[in-house]
Regions:
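Conserved acetyl-CoA pyrophosphate-binding loop and the N-cap/start of the following alpha-helix
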Residues: 102, 106-114
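Conserved N-terminal entry element of GNAT/NAT acetyltransferase domains
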Residues: 1-19
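Hydrophobic pocket/interface hotspot
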Residues: 24-25
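Short strand-connecting beta-turns/loops that link adjacent beta-strands
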Residues: 18, 72-74, 86-88
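Conserved beta-strand in the GNAT
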Residues: 68, 74-83, 92, 97
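Conserved GNAT-fold acetyl-CoA-binding loop/helix
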Residues: 32-54
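A short helix-loop-beta-strand connector motif used in the catalytic cores of GNAT acetyltransferases and
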Residues: 53-67
């Protein structure tokens, strides 16, 4: 599945690919506070590329899924998921990131509780 509508948030979700690098870069820059805290560096195009490409060396790229969440045609969130990591049958959520204007409103918790990720 590459597109999912989450009506109760007016979000659209889709799997992100390299073509969305500019939008993901914009989100990473908007979330610089998070990246400063976690990685001691600002969000950037490099950060966006890492979200799309980096994974454990023994994990095929086909086992990495990056969901993007859009609201009003703007990328406002991302979820990075690794399938069969750290071992077969396990799904690992390595990042759930929302733009600053959406934080603190329960969106992350509601997305998690809605089991959006089960629709993959």
């Amino acid at each position: 599945m590459s597109f999912l509508e989450i009506d109760f948030f007016q979000f659209h979700a889709r799997i992100l690919k390299e073509a969305e690098l500019p939008q993901l870069t914009e989100l990473c820059i908007a979330c610089t506070d998070f990246f400063q805290l976690v990685e001691q560096q600002p969000g950037s195009e490099k950060t966006a590329r890492e979200i799309l490409q980096e994974r454990p060396s023994n994990l095929p790229i086909s086992h990495k899924i990056v969901w993007g969440f859009e609201k009003d045609f703007k990328l406002v969130g991302v979820v990075e998921i690794l399938r069969d990591y750290p071992h077969s049958g396990v799904w690992y959520v390595s990042l759930l990131l929302l733009s600053p204007e959406l934080r603190g409103n329960g969106y992350g918790k509601k997305l998690w509780e809605a089991k959006v990720f089960n629709s993959i």
